[in-house]
């Protein structure tokens, strides 16, 4: 078989809904990372320097709202289908970026309050996330889940990094405030294009019951009840995997909320060079995504899951007292952490959880994970104000319980025993 035939066979599942989602992610991932290098500095300039817990409060509000909508999101995705949530909420997410554009003009209160409002609206729109992940699992065959997941993460890494570079150049060229406004205008337009493209999605869950918006509120108690009950019927491994996933989200939040400020104020990295720290992640994600996906499919899911926390600890050690170059390596390693842990976790969950329960499981993981992420951001911001290095050392300390759980509590089913 020639190279072309091999590629066609290996990626034959890239079609339909999966292909539509990939194209939309290319647009959205390029856009969403554009403001990342200078987001912390933007909030700082809009009044965050006067109120030093602004970043932590915005981060907590972001993930608290995401947690609030995660459970009904999973329930509604399983009950009524995926598409009806994904498409409208992608349009609404695009509109939320308008708050980020006009924030510098806001005079009634501190300008960063408008960032807070836009963030809350954006977080509510992410009620569609469980539907999104469930649609991916519905659309990728069992034997290709590792590669399918890795392609998603490769897209995140590949198109994130050009976004950070272009966003960084705009900010350096136009100045912090005008540059970030230009960046958020581009983000708004690209999200609008992605939402329009997602109109092509086809529903994967057939349900003839009419959808009513009152279910957003009336279904909440039922959603909580069903989301709790589903944990009684899934294998115990899924519960331990859940603990590892939410611990990972918490540990990453501890440092993500202050890493740019830490690099500027503690390590002395010049603000106009900070965006360069994200460049090596591009090469890393492109090179590593496919091999890690094949590793998950061929070698198994537990080994890459165990490698992830060790890479995380290494990344933190490189960041704590590093320079621009060691920070580049550190951020590239964080990309590997996502590849190892998310690819293996998604594949393991897909082969152990029935399709009709995947939305609820994802919603449950997101619910607890988002609360812990918000708490991690507040705690990370607080610890930074006490002693700047504390968030990094706490992250390293939490690697040990994660490793113990993965090694001794998570079991991987044999291929012949996988039902889904």
Task: Label every model-predicted segment.
Residues 26, 110-127, 326-340:
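Hydrophobic core of transmembrane alpha-helices in multi-pass small-molecule transporters
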Residues 91-108, 310-323:
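C-terminal ends and interior cores of transmembrane alpha-helices
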Residues 5-67, 237-277:
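Helix-loop boundary and gating motifs at the non-cytosolic
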Residues 127-140, 340-353:
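Intracellular juxtamembrane helix-capping segments at the cytosolic ends
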Residues 68-81, 171, 288-300, 384:
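Helix-to-loop junctions at the C-terminal end of transmembrane segments
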Residues 188-209, 402-411:
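C-terminal membrane-cytosol helix-exit motif in multi-pass small-molecule transporters
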Residues 162-179, 375-391:
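Transmembrane alpha-helix termini and helix-breaking/packing motifs in multi-pass membrane transporters
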Residues 1-15, 205-241, 420:
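Juxtamembrane intracellular "pre-TM" segments in multi-pass secondary transporters
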């Amino acid at each position: 078989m020639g190279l072309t035939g091999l590629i066609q066979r290996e990626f034959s599942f890239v079609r339909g809904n999966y292909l539509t989602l990939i194209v939309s992610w290319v647009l959205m991932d390029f856009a969403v990372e554009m403001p990342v290098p200078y987001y912390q500095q933007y909030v700082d300039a809009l009044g965050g320097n006067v109120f030093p817990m602004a970043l932590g409060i915005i981060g907590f509000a972001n993930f608290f709202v995401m947690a609030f909508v995660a459970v009904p999101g999973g329930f509604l995705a399983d009950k009524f289908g995926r598409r009806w949530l994904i498409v409208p909420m992608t349009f609404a997410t695009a509109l939320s970026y308008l708050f980020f554009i006009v924030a510098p003009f806001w005079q009634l209160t501190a300008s960063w309050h408008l960032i807070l409002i836009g963030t809350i609206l954006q977080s509510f729109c992410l009620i569609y996330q469980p539907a999104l992940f469930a649609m991916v699992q519905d659309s990728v065959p069992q034997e290709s889940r590792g590669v399918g997941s890795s392609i998603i993460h490769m897209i995140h890494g590949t198109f994130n990094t050009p976004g950070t570079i272009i966003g960084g150049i705009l900010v350096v060229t136009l100045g912090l405030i005008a540059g970030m406004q230009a960046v958020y205008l581009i983000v708004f337009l690209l999200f609008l294009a992605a939402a329009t493209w997602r109109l092509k999605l086809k529903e994967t869950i057939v349900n003839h019951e009419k959808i009513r918006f009152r279910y957003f509120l009336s279904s909440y108690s039922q959603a909580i009840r069903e989301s709790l009950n589903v944990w009684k019927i899934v294998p115990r491994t899924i519960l331990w995997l859940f603990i590892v996933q939410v611990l990972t989200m918490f540990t990453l939040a501890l440092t993500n909320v202050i890493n740019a400020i830490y690099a500027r104020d503690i390590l002395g990295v010049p603000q106009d060079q900070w965006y360069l720290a994200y460049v090596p992640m591009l090469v890393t994600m492109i090179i590593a995504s496919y091999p890690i996906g094949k590793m998950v499919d061929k070698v198994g899911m537990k080994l890459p899951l165990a490698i992830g926390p060790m890479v995380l600890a290494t990344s933190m050690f490189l960041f704590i007292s590093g320079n621009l170059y060691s920070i580049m390596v550190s951020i590239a390693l964080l990309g590997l952490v996502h590849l190892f842990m998310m690819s293996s976790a998604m594949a393991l969950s897909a082969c152990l959880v029935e399709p009709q329960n995947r939305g609820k499981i994802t919603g449950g993981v997101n619910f607890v994970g988002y609360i812990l992420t918000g708490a991690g951001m507040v705690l990370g911001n607080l610890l930074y104000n006490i002693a700047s290095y504390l968030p990094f050392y706490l992250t390293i300390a939490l690697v040990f319980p994660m490793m113990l759980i993965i090694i001794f509590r998570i079991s991987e089913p044999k291929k012949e025993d996988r039902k889904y």
